[in-house]
Structures are given as structure tokens and as C-alpha cells.
Amino acid sequence: YESVWPFGWLGLLADTPPVNPELIYAHHERGFVLCSQRSLTRSRYYLQVPLSEKVEEWSDERFWTELKRRLPDELTNKLVTGHSLEKSIAPLRSYVVEPMQYGRLFLLGDAAHIVPPTGAKGLNLAASDVNYLWRILREYYHHGRIDLLASYSRLALDRVWKGERFSWFMTRLLHDFPQQSEFDRKMQAADRRYYLESRAGLTTIAENYVGLPMERVA
């Protein structure tokens, strides 16, 4: 199962202090923005760009100028710019293989599923796969539970699809889409207000972002 998103992320890494100590997700009519801290002196920034863009066409100056356009004034005034250490464009896609096992061949991580990075679920889901398979193999080798080997795909996929759903939801919530109607934009804005202003909405995002509970294996 695959869905390719109609945009990518242009990322820039720089030895500049982060604009904010906490991660920033921002929606703007020109496209999504993400600001992240790698250390107290190193920052990573991302801009939503069309898939047709070439990284060679983005000078550092152009990147910083566009980032400032998309950030609110209180952040723009604190932004420290500098020479980039690395720039790249990553296409976004959602992808899941079913089943995640063939006999005694088990698929884990990117071999079985890919998520857009908006929900920060890629590494979490890979660790979840490892955790499920480790517990199953422990029961098999220590207690002879051969019956549990067939349960890996079901257990892993249940969590994978929930992670895919959250990444899909966050991507749709925060990005600008080609040929988006004004009605679509109004609905998207209403969604953002709900999830920012409602305790239930905030709880839903927090629960999924931190990570849903693992199922029992045996």
C-alpha cells in the first residue's frame, strides 16, 4: 500500500543556536515549516517545497529568507542564520507491506513501512517491530511457543497502521496542497484550531506523538 505526497521537505543543517528550545511545527500559506534543535549550537530547519524543486537552486540566503517569511515575527527576530553544513530535499511518501512476514522471514522498519516525517513515527515504529519480534522469539526459544511466530505480522501491523494514520493526519493538517480549494483551506484551519484549543484534541495529539501502548504477546 503506497501513497506519494505532492511535495517534499527541503532541509538545512547549520551550526547556529536554535530559534526555540522546543520543536516548532508551523503552517503557512507558502508551505509547512519545521524548526528543530540538534544541540545548543546546531539547528535543523525544513521547508515544504514542490517536488520539482532542485536543491542546487537553493542558496543559503534564499533558504533563510523563505524561512523568515513563514515564521511569525517573534521567532523571526530571534532567528540566527549562518552557513549551511548540509542541504537536501526529501520526498514524502506513505508505504506499508502486508503481511510483514513470509514463513520465518520477518520484515522490520523501513523494509516494511515508511511514513512521512511529520509525525516523527519512523524510528518509533521500527523500534516497535523489534520489540514485538524480540518478545515473540524469546517465548519461542525459552518456552517453545512456536504458535506465537505467526502472530508477529498481526501485532506489528496494528501499530504500524496507527502510526501511519497519525503521520497522514499531521501531514494533511499542516501542509499546503496543490489545487486546494478555499473550502479545503477553511476546513484545514478549523481542524488546526480545534486541536490547539480543545483539551480532547491536544490529548489526542499528545497520546499519538508520545506513542500508543504496546499489545501483550503472550
PLM regions and their residue ranges:
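Conserved FAD-binding catalytic core of PHBH/FMO-like flavoproteins
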Residues: 1-92, 97
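Short, cationic motifs built from Arg/Lys/His that form the positively charged side of catalytic pockets
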Residues: 56, 104, 156-157
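Short FAD-binding loop at a beta-strand-to-alpha-helix junction that anchors the flavin cofactor
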Residues: 99-117
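C-terminal structured domain segments across diverse proteins
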Residues: 105-110, 124-125, 133
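A conserved FAD-binding loop/helix module that cradles the flavin
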Residues: 117-127
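C-terminal helical "tail/cap" subdomain of flavin- and related membrane-associated enzymes
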Residues: 118-120, 135-218
